[in-house]
Amino acid sequence: MKHIASCSFGKDSLATILLALEHGEPLDEVVYCEVMFDKEISGEVPEHRDFIYTTAIPALERRGVKVTVLRSEKTYVDLFTGKITRGPKKGLLRSFPICGRCAVQRDCKLKPILRYQKSLPPDTV
């Protein structure tokens, strides 16, 4: 059985992972889904992105935890400038995401995670 934790590298998810390691809980892999602003620029605050890649990921890897970084083919800019394809607002620009109906969450985070989940063995937790 493979044990995977999803991680945003915020205080809560990172604390959960560190506590699991400290208490000997099984943990084979950590999955982080990075939302990109455009094809080259991360949507993360630059200091947080630096922390993730130069401190957090190397620290987990030193403890024997594989870290997988996922990214969507779509970016924030793609969604912001994309056109609505159906409904009464068909043809209008999507522009700013709306809370509760956020295409960024759906297309830039959830889809890559679900795609990755389908590639895993069925007994993955």
Residue ranges, per PLM feature:
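ATP-dependent adenylation/nucleotidyltransferase module used to activate substrates
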Residues: M1-V125
